[in-house]
């Protein structure tokens, strides 16, 4: 079972949402600067401003690419490696439905008050930024 699950809905086409999830320049508009390439085995890095608790770096490796429906990669940051999976579907309403899962948090992290909630909060904010980017 996923530790964090979120569902988003966009009026943009599935191809537009896929591009926002896989194009480095688009990702930089709603997550952080990066060198992401959507190919299995590709290693990448997201870079944000560091703070007193975090170095601002997320390392990852692409695990699965099934354009335009499934994208999965590792998300390694602050000593923890989890797996991110995005699943895209076009609904009967012609909207693009985007399902997000983050799995693999350590038992220590799960036991830390607010850690999973913090991850959910961050990804919810990223989803709101993604919506703004898609509406431009």
Positions of predicted regions on the chain:
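Hydrophobic ligand-binding cavity/cleft-lining segments
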Residues: 1-35
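A generic structural signal for beta-strand entry/edge sites
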Residues: 3, 43, 68-70, 93-97
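Generic structural detector for well-ordered beta-strands
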Residues: 7-11, 45-47, 61, 87
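Hydrophobic pocket/interface hotspot
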Residues: 17, 27, 44-46, 62, ...
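Tryptophan-centric aromatic hotspots in well-structured domains and transmembrane helices
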Residues: 18-21, 30, 75, 86, ...
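A solvent-exposed, acidic/Ser-Thr-rich amphipathic alpha-helical stretch
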Residues: 33-44, 53-54
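Hydrophobic-ligand binding "helix-grip"
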Residues: 52-93, 103-106, 132
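A conserved amphipathic terminal alpha-helix motif
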Residues: 103-136
């Amino acid at each position: 079972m996923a530790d964090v699950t979120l569902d988003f809905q966009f009026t943009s086409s599935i191809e537009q949402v896929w591009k926002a999830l896989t194009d480095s320049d688009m990702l930089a508009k709603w997550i952080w600067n990066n060198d992401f390439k959507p190919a299995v085995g590709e290693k990448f890095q997201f870079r944000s401003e560091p703070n007193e608790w975090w170095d601002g770096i997320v390392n990852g490796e692409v695990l699965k690419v099934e354009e335009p429906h499934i994208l999965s990669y590792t998300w390694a940051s602050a000593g923890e490696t989890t797996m991110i999976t995005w699943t895209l579907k076009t609904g009967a309403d012609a909207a693009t439905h985007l399902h997000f899962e983050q799995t693999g948090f350590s038992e220590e992290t799960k036991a830390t008050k607010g850690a999973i909630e913090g991850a959910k909060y961050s990804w919810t904010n990223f989803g709101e930024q993604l919506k703004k980017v898609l509406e431009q």
